[in-house]
From Swiss-Prot:
This is Small, acid-soluble spore protein P. GO terms for biological process: asexual sporulation; sporulation resulting in formation of a cellular spore. It comes from the Bacteria. It comes from Bacillus velezensis (strain DSM 23117 / BGSC 10A6 / LMG 26770 / FZB42) (Bacillus amyloliquefaciens subsp. plantarum). The lineage of its organism: Bacteria, Bacillati, Bacillota, Bacilli, Bacillales. Induction: Expressed only in the forespore compartment of sporulating cells.
């Protein structure tokens, strides 16, 4: 009974803002940062 409650609580807390909140934004931030960096560098070169 306690295990079921913990599992439900962990599952709700994990995918709510722990699992999809940390690995997803981390992976997306890395890809977006890399893309943004390349775009910014290109933009700076073009502006110059």
């Amino acid at each position: 009974m306690t295990n079921k409650n913990t599992s439900k609580d962990m599952h709700k807390n994990a995918p709510k803002g722990h699992n999809p909140g940390q690995p997803e934004p981390l992976s997306g931030s890395k890809k977006v940062k890399n893309r943004n960096h390349t775009r910014q560098k290109h933009n700076t070169s073009h502006d110059m």
